Amino acid sequence: MSWSLHPRNLILYFYALLFLSSTCVAYVATRDNCCILDERFGSYCPTTCGIADFLSTYQTKVDKDLQSLEDILHQVENKTSEVKQLIKAIQLTYNPDESSKPNMIDAATLKSRKMLEEIMKYEASILTHDSSIRYLQEIYNSNNQKIVNLKEKVAQLEAQCQEPCKDTVQIHDITGKDCQDIANKGAKQSGLYFIKPLKANQQFLVYCEIDGSGNGWTVFQKRLDGSVDFKKNWIQYKEGFGHLSPTGTTEFWLGNEKIHLISTQSAIPYALRVELEDWNGRTSTADYAMFKVGPEADKYRLTYAYFAGGDAGDAFDGFDFGDDPSDKFFTSHNGMQFSTWDNDNDKFEGNCAEQDGSGWWMNKCHAGHLNGVYYQGGTYSKASTPNGYDNGIIWATWKTRWYSMKKTTMKIIPFNRLTIGEGQQHHLGGAKQVRPEHPAETEYDSLYPEDDL
């Protein structure tokens, strides 16, 4: 163990030097008394003188060392006092009793555990955010690629726009006053054509059905998939709605004003053909001679001379449903004005067009109704209708009122082009006359005043 630093060693060293110093002070050897016998050093005088000389030589150095040790002791005492004061201050500040130490350790442990849990949560959150950042970076890169692709497409479209526009729908060049006129001019293909009836201010587009015999039918109604909602207002039925296609595979209503202009334009009357198809693929037809639709001033009234034949039967003449003796009379359509939900012209105290969801030549209400609601599968019931009425696409003389057709077509042709098939009537004697309340309607050319589209 080193004696240089430990306070206890310094104290011992100090007392040893003090003892020697006191001895030297008690007896200082000189040349005069060197040989005087001194009983403390025995009988050998020279030895006593040697010790005296030795002590005399080192006395000054010892005094310096003593002074230095005293200074060090004072410093040690000062430091010791400071340490004691510091210990006392620490004890005053923090001096738990033995019983509280376990609780404090537990509290510190719990606090450490919570801190670790928080650290783990932050680490997990950092990992989650890193994952989100990577995901967003991927989306950002993907969107940048999409933007590049869109810019390329825009550039392609801009290049295409520099070229002259071309119609993607084929519209034939031949025009006429109706589709039969177009067929007479040499048209052989069914499709879209412009016609301009004699009293029309401008031409309009129609779908012409041209057969191999040179018959040109002007189609004004088509149902085939339920893609078009036929619950429209008066203006929409007047102008027409739906879509015309070159292949005749879209639903539409040509427009009451156009039907009126076509069907009343010449002395040659028109014939109406109704084509029906059920959900089993069976088809049937019904033909009506001298068909026409009046002007808007007369609410686009429907009239015809007689039923010209067809296996679908004459639903326009009404049908006896067995509900009332007057069923047939109040479900006939000849002479009826056109009705829509916002323009009621029927014979019913209610509104047939509103309750049946369509526009039609309503009586009270109908036996044939080709603008009705499109029911998938055909069969429907009172429970499936909003008001419990037969509102489907019906033709009561071929199917029941609770069977809705899959496909229908209404088209007209000049009466002299009507093909006479097996079982069809073609004689005026079998004509069914118009209701007595409208006797003038049998005169085809004199009923309507001149009017324009």
Swiss-Prot record:
Impact upon substituting residue 334 to I: In Baltimore-3; impaired polymerization
Result for mutant: residue 404 to P: In DYSFIBRIN; fibrinogen Philadelphia
Outcome of swapping residue 345 to D: In CAFBN; hypofibrinogenemia; heterozygous; no effect on fibrinogen complex assembly; decreased fibrinogen complex secretion
Sequence ranges assigned to domain Fibrinogen C-terminal in this UniProt record: 170-416
Classification via SUPFAM superfamilies: Fibrinogen C-terminal domain-like, Fibrinogen coiled-coil and central regions
Effect on the protein upon substituting residue 334 to K: In Kyoto-1; causes accelerated cleavage by plasmin
Impact after mutating residue 303 to P: In CAFBN; hypofibrinogenemia; heterozygous; no effect on fibrinogen complex assembly; impaired fibrinogen complex secretion
Chief location category: secreted
Known outcome of mutating residue 301 to C: In Tochigi/Osaka-2/Milano-5/Villajoyosa
Localization annotation: Secreted
Alphabetized SMART domains for the sequence: FBG, Fib_alpha
InterPro entries documented for this protein: FIB_ANG-like, Fibrinogen-like_C, Fibrinogen_a/b/g_C_1, Fibrinogen_a/b/g_C_dom, Fibrinogen_a/b/g_coil_dom, Fibrinogen_CS
Outcome reported for the amino acid change (mutating residue 318 to V): In DYSFIBRIN; fibrinogen Baltimore-1; impaired polymerization
Effect on the protein upon substituting residue 327 to H: In CAFBN; hypofibrinogenemia; heterozygous; no effect on fibrinogen complex assembly; no effect on fibrinogen complex secretion
Residues annotated to bind Ca(2+): 344, 346, 348, 350
GO molecular function: cell adhesion molecule binding; extracellular matrix structural constituent; metal ion binding; signaling receptor binding; structural molecule activity
Result for mutant: residue 356 to Y: In Kyoto-3; impaired polymerization
Protein role: Together with fibrinogen alpha (FGA) and fibrinogen beta (FGB), polymerizes to form an insoluble fibrin matrix. Has a major function in hemostasis as one of the primary components of blood clots. In addition, functions during the early stages of wound repair to stabilize the lesion and guide cell migration during re-epithelialization. Was originally thought to be essential for platelet aggregation, based on in vitro studies using anticoagulated blood. However, subsequent studies have shown that it is not absolutely required for thrombus formation in vivo.
Disease affiliated with this protein: Congenital afibrinogenemia: Rare autosomal recessive disorder is characterized by bleeding that varies from mild to severe and by complete absence or extremely low levels of plasma and platelet fibrinogen. Dysfibrinogenemia, congenital: A disorder characterized by qualitative abnormalities (dysfibrinogenemia) of the circulating fibrinogen. Affected individuals are frequently asymptomatic, but some patients have bleeding diathesis, thromboembolic complications, or both. In some cases, dysfibrinogenemia is associated with low circulating fibrinogen levels (hypodysfibrinogenemia).
PANTHER family assigned: FIBRINOGEN ALPHA CHAIN (PTHR47221:SF6)
Note: The gamma-chain carries the main binding site for the platelet receptor.
Protein name: Fibrinogen gamma chain
Organism annotation: Homo sapiens (Human)
Gene assigned in the entry: FGG
